[in-house]
């Protein structure tokens, strides 16, 4: 069997995407194994080059992402739904917020919750009195973990959800560029987009796994279960955790993993509450309010600050802010895909508010509780002991807990939380990598692919950590995130173009229902209004008014204009319907349908003696629906000729708009683009 046949029959992978990615990764691993010192020098030079020449770009790009989302949220484009106009959200608002809250949790908060504020507090980036230094330390931490990170996630998530649920394209990164590339998203340019996204995601996940492995080793050492946190131990940790993640991915125990994830969130929240209560509670609550104010009041200045006038701080700026911005870029497809999948049916305004505000507020709370408490302990009971350990940030959380009650219990809980975050991140990472690398997002990936991704992530993480520790992982993230950040700016332009095409398309209205009313039929109209229609009445209307109107129009379109037209009668389904479909070769078919829609009637109306015609708890109406997902309207007062006129109005709208903006929105069905 040839390689191409094998790839087609035995995998869901896109040969070019996976081939280019594996070539890059294998080349990197080979270089490290064959010439470790030279490769280390090369990575350091590349990292220094990006710091020196592209830091400004990262700063401006992240400000653009945030500004872009804010503009969308306050404009009329914010009213657009992520799905059809009548689409209801898949999850309730509170459930959706809870899932966004879950997306904001992870290994990073456990690793940096204590370490980062304390490190900034003791560095020369903060100045003045101890109180002022503490305030600035929290400010810089919150800037790194706040709304900018979620603006990056939100940009990708919004593009994925919009083009996936509104344009009916596959939930894939290449789909986000449809307004710019059209059908070329299915060609080599689409493959290039996926390659860049795959590399960024791969190294972003690997970096997170590296942080998790080093902190798990430190936790085991702190609890006295091992003698030292060695590299060999971290290899064992990565192997064990990745084996569990692979088992989860191939065994169909997703429901069990979901339960573990919910348990883990509960444990993390309990740990947060414990530190809040066991620490200086009133001080922390006051600091939480103060930190929010300090963060918001300095947000604009920090968003554009490159330290060009403070050269003594450029090393700190590169090693913290720019590395974070690169990490968030590489992590964005991972988090963005999750957010997109749970956000169907939300308006863009609601989506942006939820994604930017809820996780950011939780991040402020987390770093306030852990960061402010750590600094408070370091300056008090710990007498500087915690500050002496900032060069080993993986150990700081456990040393920090030693100064609080029940340190043995909380240390064990922290270890469990980190382990479960590690497992669920790796499991989800396997899914996302499979999704990006697949040639058809609707295909189920074979089990061996999960094993391949798990082994690949483990090997690359181990090799990079062995050659240069976490610094090498961060260097690779920085390198692959730069082109992806450029890609994201193009994504913003593509999304803007799509949204404006959408607004122009759907703002073109057709006057429904009563536009045809004239005074000569007022008695008939009144009689219809005074009748509480039931399903049998609507079925009769569909069969004796709508269907004959469609047949008459179909006969004219076929006989005189040689169009391909069909009528679908769907009287046996839960919502009886009839459809007129005018078929096209390249564009999406025009479809005008009418279906029976039931709605509940309130008890007050039924019991009102002045409304004797309302006797039933349900009333039914014939509502239109269309090929492009627009919200329909009631047509029960139309006669046969008026229905034909209504269908022609929509067909004229279809033809005039399709040549202008509609071709970007309605040119293809989802199945065609998934092939």
What feature does the model see in each segment?
Residues 10-25, 182-191, 229-246, 250, ...:
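Loop-to-transmembrane helix boundary motifs in multi-pass membrane proteins
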Residues 3-10, 35-50, 69-90, 137-144, ...:
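Membrane-water interface regions at transmembrane-helix termini and the short interhelical loops
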Residues 2-8, 41-47, 74-93, 118-140, ...:
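Flexible loop linkers connecting adjacent transmembrane helices
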Residues 8-16, 51-56, 85-103, 138-147, ...:
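Transmembrane-helix boundary/entry motifs in multi-pass membrane transporters
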Residues 9-19, 23-33, 66-71, 105-110, ...:
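Helix-loop-helix module between adjacent transmembrane segments
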């Amino acid at each position: 069997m040839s390689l191409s046949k094998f790839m087609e029959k035995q995998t869901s992978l896109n040969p070019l995407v996976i081939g280019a990615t594996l070539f890059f990764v294998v080349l990197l691993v080979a270089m490290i194994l064959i010439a470790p010192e030279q490769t280390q020098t090369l990575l350091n030079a590349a990292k220094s080059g990006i710091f020196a020449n592209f830091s400004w770009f990262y700063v401006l790009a992240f400000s653009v992402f945030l500004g872009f989302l804010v503009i969308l949220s306050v404009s009329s484009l914010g009213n657009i739904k992520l799905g059809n106009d009548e689409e209801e959200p898949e999850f309730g608002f509170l459930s959706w917020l809870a899932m966004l809250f879950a997306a904001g949790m992870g290994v990073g908060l456990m690793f940096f919750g204590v370490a980062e504020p304390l490190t900034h507090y003791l560095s020369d980036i903060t100045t003045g009195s101890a109180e002022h230094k503490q305030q600035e330390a929290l400010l810089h931490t919150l800037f790194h973990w706040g709304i900018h990170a979620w603006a990056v996630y939100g940009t990708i998530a919004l593009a994925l959800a919009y083009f996936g649920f509104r344009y009916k394209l596959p939930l894939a990164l290449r789909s986000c560029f449809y307004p710019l590339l059209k059908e070329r998203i299915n060609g080599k340019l689409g493959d290039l987009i996926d390659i860049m996204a795959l590399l960024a995601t791969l190294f972003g996940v690997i970096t997170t796994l590296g942080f998790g492995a080093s902190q798990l080793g430190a936790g085991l050492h702190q609890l006295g279960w091992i003698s030292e946190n060695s590299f060999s131990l971290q290899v064992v940790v990565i192997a064990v955790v990745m084996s569990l993640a692979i088992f989860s991915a191939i065994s169909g125990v997703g429901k069990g993993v979901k339960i573990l994830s919910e348990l883990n969130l509960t444990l993390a929240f309990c740990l947060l509450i414990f530190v809040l209560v066991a620490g200086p509670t009133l001080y922390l609550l006051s600091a939480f309010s103060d930190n929010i104010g300090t963060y918001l009041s300095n947000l604009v200045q920090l968003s554009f600050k490159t330290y060009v006038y403070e050269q003594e701080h450029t090393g700190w700026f590169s090693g913290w802010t720019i590395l974070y911005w690169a990490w968030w870029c590489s992590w964005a497809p991972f988090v963005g895909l999750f957010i997109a999948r749970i956000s169907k049916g939300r308006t863009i305004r609601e989506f942006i508010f939820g994604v930017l505000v809820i996780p950011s507020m939780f991040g402020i709370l987390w770093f306030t509780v852990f960061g402010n408490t750590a600094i408070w302990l370091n300056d008090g009971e710990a007498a500087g002991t915690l500050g002496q350990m900032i060069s080993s940030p993986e150990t700081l959380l456990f040393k920090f807990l030693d100064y609080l009650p029940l340190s043995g219990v909380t240390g064990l809980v922290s270890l469990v939380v980190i382990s479960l975050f590690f497992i669920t991140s790796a499991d989800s990472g396997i899914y996302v990598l499979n999704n990006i690398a697949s040639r058809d997002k609707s295909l189920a990936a074979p089990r061996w692919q999960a094993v391949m991704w798990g082994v690949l992530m483990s090997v690359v993480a181990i090799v990079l950590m062995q050659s240069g520790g976490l610094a090498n992982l961060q260097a690779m993230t920085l390198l692959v995130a730069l082109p992806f950040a450029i890609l994201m700016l193009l994504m913003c332009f593509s999304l803007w173009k799509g949204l404006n095409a959408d607004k122009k398309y759907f703002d073109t209205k057709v006057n429904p229902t009563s536009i045809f009313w004239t005074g000569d039929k007022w008695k008939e109209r009144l009689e219809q209004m005074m009748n509480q229609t039931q399903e049998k009445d609507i079925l009769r209307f569909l069969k004796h008014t709508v269907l004959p109107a469609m047949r008459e129009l179909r006969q004219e379109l076929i006989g005189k204009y040689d169009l391909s037209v069909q009528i679908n009668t769907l009287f046996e389904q839960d919502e009886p319907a009839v459809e007129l479909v005018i078929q096209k070769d390249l564009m999406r078919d025009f479809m005008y349908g009418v279906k029976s829609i039931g709605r509940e009637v309130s008890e007050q109306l039924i019991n009102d003696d002045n409304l004797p015609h309302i006797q039933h708890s349900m009333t039914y109406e014939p509502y239109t629906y269309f090929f492009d997902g627009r919200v329909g309207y009631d047509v029960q007062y139309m006669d046969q000729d008026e229905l034909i006129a209504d269908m022609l109005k929509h067909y004229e709208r279809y033809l005039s708009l399709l040549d202008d903006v509609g071709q970007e929105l309605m040119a293809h069905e989802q199945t065609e683009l998934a092939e």
